[in-house]
């Protein structure tokens, strides 16, 4: 029934298995891949006919995690998977980015890649094996895909690179880098680092590229046994159309790209396009070429004109040389009620970034395959259509917004203080108000400033820069702080974020082969210079965190109590903790470890709640005198509430210096008294005394009573002696 083909290899100390022919046989390509006990199914389906009226590759990648993969049932009311989680969106992008450049130019058939996590061993993250499985499925499918690709995760532990570290091993790593590419070239890098130098980052990229070569070889062996016949597809030859477009529009395009203002430049380019269309594909009359063909050729000519100009003259679209960063203006404290805010403007790219501090109640619960955990640092990126002078859809964030937000999150996250040092939930929101390239890096810069404005003690300011590359044969130009047009028309887009000490995040997307390690090294060194310049410009607004939190931010006080005292603070059914919250107005978060966070914008409320809790958990000292209240009387004594919520017994013999016949002769319920803590009996019961305390002054009269008893005994002794004489 099944024609199963299989490849196995030992990779990074664990077995990688690729299998096809048994599951999802109606898909164009399907591979079940296992790494350790993490298993995914990758499928590819591409329509037989192209999608009419489009000028882009209609590729969709969907990565989906199933709760059963980790032996869990989804939370929520419906108990089934719903909309994609942030991780599913991010991994979908991680798979998409290295495979998209490898489709043959001109492929317009709707293509969908679906990767489903079937099993998760909680050791091997499914993202790497998902990328490998998707690559294998595409290679088998027959679509014009110029792969395969390999992928690997690289950690950095004890100054040594580590291939595909487990989830547990990653906790001790100062680097989390994912790299993907073909046999000959790196195509994609995504990373977070703890201020590592550029040479370590580049070394990690090359280490990963070297060590995923066996995976590519295994996919090729599998394809030799199981690949489908390649689709019959011939890309459209645009050379004749391009020649015609160049003759009509080259001079005008060169003039259009001398305009430094984005909207003016776009208007000029549109005018050239209209002229070319009217000449080569008029709406009325005889057309020399198909309209769609002319549009595609015009895009190619646009790119060539810009690229030639940069390589020939060293001058860019907006007149800068290749190393110059656009003018920067940084402002902080721009919103009066926000906890921290910044407006970061770099050329025609602008981000309004706001930092908000919250309490434990504001932590985000993440329901992942590895289990539910809390996230205390949130960074959200919004890209409204007005930022590029357009109208468009508004609503929930798209994949691009989630991806850019996560990139900025990775850049800032390594600089945040530890939770025990700064026990706040932090949310940063970046509103992109203008965009002409590098808005994610503007978000990094604005986030750094907004956090410092809020009083968050970042270890150092962090900045980011987007770099580009133009490569033609042996000639190349690395571009600092790229514009949107340079991003689209260039061969490499990579973003570097970091501090004066090192890199915290590196994202790289390479569109062509031929980019060598040396070119990447030049680009990273140039990015370092650009980052240093940006940090200097940011320092004009703020150099470090403000010494105090923002005026409207909540204050949080932390305290540690013994874990066996947590029940006493909470009380039966939460009675005690509710009373503290209601009477002080403070927010209180109690953790299983005994850490208590008390939050309020009012310092007096924090102090009142702190003292209340301290009185509950503190132990009374033997020999000390405390105020108390009679809560119950019995024949043998009275129970006194003292020292917060503690109750102890004053035995009838300890009520008063004189003999007491009846407890109620001395005290009644509700009486305010002063008691001395004598300690605990062998059963742990608290023993108190009233008779050794002056009920008026609170003075300890133990010695006075001893002296009186001694005097009484002396008088009795003298009386006996006198009677005997």
From Swiss-Prot:
Keywords in alphabetical order: Cytoplasm, Magnesium, Metal-binding, Nucleotidyltransferase, RNA-binding, Transferase
Enzymatic reactions: RNA(n+1) + phosphate = RNA(n) + a ribonucleoside 5'-diphosphate
Keyword Cell cycle belongs to the record: no
Domain S1 motif: 623-691
Domain (KH): residue spans on this chain: 554-613
Comp. bias (Basic and acidic residues): 701-719
Family note: Belongs to the polyribonucleotide nucleotidyltransferase family.
GO terms under biological process: mRNA catabolic process; RNA processing
Described function: Involved in mRNA degradation. Catalyzes the phosphorolysis of single-stranded polyribonucleotides processively in the 3'- to 5'-direction.
Major localization listed first in the record, in broad terms: cytoplasm
PANTHER family cross-referenced by the UniProt entry: POLYRIBONUCLEOTIDE NUCLEOTIDYLTRANSFERASE (PTHR11252), POLYRIBONUCLEOTIDE NUCLEOTIDYLTRANSFERASE 1, MITOCHONDRIAL (PTHR11252:SF0)
Identification of the protein by name: Polyribonucleotide nucleotidyltransferase
Coiled coil (UniProt feature): none
A GO MF term: magnesium ion binding
Region annotated Disordered, chain positions: 697-725
Binding-site positions, Mg(2+): 487, 493
Top enzyme category: transferase
